[in-house]
Amino acid sequence: MGMENLLNYYFIMKKRFVTVLLACSLAGGLFAQQPWFKDKDLTLTGAYYYPEHWDESQWERDFKQMHDLGFEFTHFAEFAWAQLEPEEGKYDFSWLDKAVALAAKYDLKVIMCTSTATPPVWMSRKYPEILIKNENGTVLDHGARQHASFASPVYRELAYKMIEKLAQHYGNDSRIIGWQLDNEPAVQFDYNPKAELAFRDFLREKYHHDIKALNDAWGTAFWSEVYSSFDEITLPKTAQMFMNHHQILDYRRFAASQTNDFLNEQCLLIKKYAKNQWVTTNYIPNYEEGHIGGSPADRKSVV
């Protein structure tokens, strides 16, 4: 190819390149004016916020920044039981009312959370029987979270009282779009005496009060594990070598049932007052199987 032909080829390709760039630019402008999805089809975005953790003077600044970043909602009261009920039976929602009002000022809807993952210290001290007991005998204590046993009737009663007060206060508030139950609920291997009694009741119901049916399901004829009464059954000792895996599996099912029942009762309480607010929960997907969830039928009221 001669020099003249080479120059002609260069200018032709340059014109084509500029034409393609111009076409792409026009197409980009066209698509920029026509969003792929309608706003109503997009997922809402929000952020957890803990007003009890921050000085009140910072709240408005933070909510404004959330709004400026495009967030549309926030979560409140996830771990705030001590602030909601500083003393047994004495409730204080005044600080939360201020936070809800400020969030609304910046067009942020609120997801209200039940604080059952973090019972206050007065409860642990006054009612130590609510605390989870590990297999090695260690009793969990105040200072972390999720240290209360779902099998404890006392803990449940106190939780339901607090939740009902919260639902009465915010159930008809249009600024509240929904509720989150607990936080990442899970059931540990809980050796609280109430858990063992509840496990036996779970087995009685599952096997229709027929101890032979349980023995057959668990294969207890092997190694002389046969039971003659449900009262002889204890919680499975996972540290013990060759523990009956059917017993462990039924314990996991029991744990899931306890979790579902606790969440279900919370939901029913809230729904008494929150007719136009949805209710859900959250969890970590890598929790051990059986500790969270269950079938959709188990959670039919959590909607």
Protein language model annotation of sequence segments:
Residues 6, 10-20:
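Bacterial N-terminal signal peptides that target proteins for export
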Residues 19-29:
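Bacterial N-terminal signal peptides
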Residues 34-58, 64-72:
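An acidic-aromatic substrate-binding cleft motif
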Residues 40-43, 70-72, 104-110, 172-177, ...:
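Short, well-ordered coil/turn segments that N-cap beta-strands
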Residues 50-52, 77-80, 113-122, 177-186, ...:
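Short, solvent-exposed turn/loop segments enriched in Gly/Ser/Thr/Pro and often Arg
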Residues 60-140, 164-167, 265-273:
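Aromatic-lined substrate-binding rim segments of carbohydrate-active enzymes
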Residues 136, 140-298:
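Polysaccharide-binding and catalytic clefts of secreted carbohydrate-active enzymes
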Residues 302-303:
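Conserved small/polar residues in nucleotide/adenosyl-binding loops
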